[in-house]
Amino acid sequence: MKAEIITVGDELLTGNTVDSNSAFIASKLTEKGYLVRRITTVGDDVEEIKSIILEALDRKPDVLVISGGLGPTHDDVTMLAVSKALNRELELCEECLERIRKFYVELHKKGLIDDPELNEARKKMAYLPKGATPLQNTEGAAPGAFIEHEGIKIFVLPGMPREMKAMLLNEVLPRLGERTFIQKKYLAEITDESKLAPILSEAIRKFNVRIHSSPKGFGKYIGIIIFGEDEEIIEKVIEFMQSRGISFKEGW
């Protein structure tokens, strides 16, 4: 099962904002058993976002998660780009509009904004691509969207980390179903990654697991993560590597 992630925002490309969203999304998709094959960042330009989406769809991932660009300002154009990429008109979601209205009324009651009225900028957030299922935003105004397109599950989420995380956990992950997936982290006592490489390759072929290695500077340990669906198989991988002379301790 493969997945791709697209994060949207000029601020990500200028370095003014660190893209923590893609790391969080990738970690949760990995826990669900998805292999994240690509993470792409694009600026707030309709045609560029559309192009990146079309490129991702051509690779036929099982899941595509897009984050950012759903707010009320002029440069929040992600939903428009999605509609263009999928050739679906934007339609007003009345349910979303009512939630947005209530959101601003509550902010006004708390004294956080001066005007609770639904101006055109706020109404813009209630438009979703035709056929999309709205995803509830419990932490903000802009709804997300879930679209099934040619067998690909597409999720469009806000860029604010608090809003994105809540929507991912509450709306996205439940739609991906339940799948047992395990990742175990170890430190392999070996100083040369090149000597470890053939052993890892043999283990991957033999046990049908995914293994990621990461050198820890020039110390005597190399970090290893083993991904699989069966804990017994992962233990057999460790036993196999130990039989090849590699010592382990748990950690990372």
From Swiss-Prot:
Pfam families hit by this protein: MoCF_biosynth
UniProt record similarity statement: Belongs to the CinA family.
Protein's name in the database: Protein PYRAB15930
Upper lineage: Archaea, Methanobacteriati, Methanobacteriota, Thermococci, Thermococcales
